[in-house]
Amino acid sequence: MAGRRFGWSRAALLQLILGVNLMVMPRTQARTLRFVTLLYRHGDRSPVKAYPKDPHQEDKWPQGFGQLTKEGMLQHWELGQALRQRYHGFLNTSYHRQEVYVRSTDFDRTLMSAEANLAGLFPPDGIQRFNPNISWQPIPVHTVPVAEDRLLKFPLGPCPRFEQLQNETRRMPEYQNESVQNAQFLDMVANETGLTDLSLETVWNVYDTLFCEQTHGLPLPPWASPQTMQRLSRLKDFSFRFLFGIYKQAEKARLQGGVLLAQIRKNLTLMATTSQLPKLLVYSAHDTTLVALHMALGVYNGEQAPYASCHMFELYQEDSGNFSVEMYFRNESHRAPWPLTLPGCSHRCPLQDFLRLTEPVVPKDWLQECQLAGGPADTEVIVALAVCGSILFLLIVLLLTVLFRVQAQPPGYRHVPDGEDHA
């Protein structure tokens, strides 16, 4: 009996210790991934154009200029596979149209990149296979005409205020110093390429062409030495900073990357309150799109976004019920994505803080903010006021004329009939 009583006491003591430990030990933070937005650059492509003296013209490229290559297709298929692994358990292993929405700019290379990416992300499984020998299924990619794209094709335009900011940027010391320091170099490149309108803002085209040719094993001309290529690469990165930074970066962001950021903020807020969007929203675009967004967010690393690089926005619901945003940038295929931290916030940024910190670079009315002081909108007001003023002036003149004539008639004057009847 004594042993039995001891056994019960030991069990009771164990329960007591476990109960105390459960109260003392902190609860594990349970987080739920609720929503993901991806923005990626297209994969490897042929050059957009050749320079006049280029020995490698468009006929050297199987599909012509600006087209996705087989290497680019593979890059995006591999990115799709990496995303499939990263979001395993969040996304269904097979494609469900209610879960995913993809939008691309209206360029062959971005549309095809999205399709290659989706092939890696959602290989058909079971009943989704329409042919047992084909491990692929069609998944919709949406787009709008380039002329109507006010979300993904940068720089956005026409925007008179942005053009004015660019003109003002050209007068900044940093831009002037670059112009002076590279004047002879640009003259040399212009002479070797046959280009007549080469500048700090257009020299990236030369680097892009040479880079594409070098990547695909085409011989470069003797003047395109490693030192020249390195210098061209630096000027290419400078051209991105000219577009979106150097001078009044926040205002430039409101007119450029802030437009896309506004849509991303709207989607994050909507998913935190109503869950009415797909779980995965994908944008397939360009290096300028990524740089514009990174400049608006204050996370730009100063370099061109490489092929198939991908910015990730992940919306989490914390154990407390509150929401937070985490950002990552995958710019290398052989390592995990880099965590990005919004200036002024932690990496795990509370949604309300994310919205507050990004508010200054989001336009309230893009069309209005694009107008110049005294621009078209103001001109319309001035014209309207001028018309109203002219009408008012004519009415006053007419009224004064009538009054003058009345006062000019002799006192007591009355019309006297002449006595004739007019039939």
UniProtKB/Swiss-Prot annotation:
Protein name: Lysosomal acid phosphatase
Residue intervals on the Cytoplasmic side: 402-423
Record-annotated active site: H42, D287
Cellular-component GO terms for this entry: lysosomal lumen; lysosomal membrane; lysosome
Compartment annotation: Lysosome membrane; Lysosome lumen
GO molecular function: acid phosphatase activity
Encoding gene, per UniProt annotation: ACP2
Keyword Acetylation in record: no
Coiled coil: none
